């Protein structure tokens, strides 16, 4: 084997190892590559303003679930806030998961973890079809946005917001009045893979 080919083999091996390491450690999130355009619109919404932070997670470190399998979501904020949790499916179908029928108030105390669903809630958060599901977590120190007041649909635990993610993203930002008031706003998201 010529020295050039040997060098090329080493470079390709190093690049492959580096990409695998980055994906495994979260430096590069491989799930970002599979978000649909409708999901990216929500994930890329510019909501963060002020110094409040938000943390979110699901109950599985590998974030992989079977179709129809229940998921447990957790969120906490660094300040007293109002929180909303959205589920965005690959086709853009968006559901407001929190506030919900069991928790009509969107309030969360600073540095306390909110878990949805809680064991006594009587409902489950699931995804029925394989693909990547985006969970967007939004918080504000002001509670006047429709996102924190929206009631669930009749005979449902949640509110269906439709499939127009671009319109929903714009409406969320407008309703939160990001940067136009003294309120802190923060958002983060978690993606899960449904197999």
Describe the residue ranges of each PLM region.
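Bacterial N-terminal signal peptides that target proteins for export
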Residues: 1-8
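Secretory-pathway glycoprotein ectodomains that are cysteine- and/or Ser/Thr/Pro-rich
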Residues: 19-195
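Short, linear, compositionally biased motifs with a strong N-terminal bias
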Residues: 10-13
